[in-house]
Amino acid sequence: KLIFDEFIIRPSEIEEDIPSAINYELAAEYLASKKANSVVKKSNELVIGCDTVVTAGNIILGKPHDCKECRKMLRLLSGRTHSVYTGVSIIFNGKEFCFTEKTDVKFRNISDEEIEEYMNTGEPFDKAGGYGIQGRGALFVQSICGDYFNVVGLPVSRLNYELKKIVL
């Protein structure tokens, strides 16, 4: 709603597997492109696909499948800086334009008790890296360098800038 007053959400049914040959910095863009291309119906429509991945070092952290995986992710992020990459694919008039936005997030040290309490909310299981900065996951954040909305999952300022170049 920040960019468009009206839009239609078409969920993608793609498998979110990332080929091992893809650089972790481009993984989100790869998935965003797959999503956008899977839902485009007409050549003259505007389609925006996006995907977010979290990396700790060279390790890509997707959405945790269970408590064990979530616990491992949050322990890995505890007390460290990690990177959040959101890839965006814009399809317009049969052409595709892609970009990736990066934001660095530093977590404070998180206790095992805090991790268990957070997992019990159910919040972390549908989010890359096992946390949502827009929810209770914000309680773990010590600092952020970059676009907050990128960590939420859509870098709206950059998207607006890129759309103006493409559509106008």
Question: At which residue positions do the language-model features occur?
Answer:
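Short loop/helix-cap segments at secondary-structure boundaries that form the rim of catalytic
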Residues: 1-2, 19, 41-42
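Short glycine-rich, Thr/Ser-proximal phosphate-binding strand/loop in the N-terminal lobe
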Residues: 5-19, 96-102
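Anionic-ligand binding patches
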Residues: 22-168
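N-terminal G-site helix/loop of the GST-like fold
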Residues: 1-10, 166-168
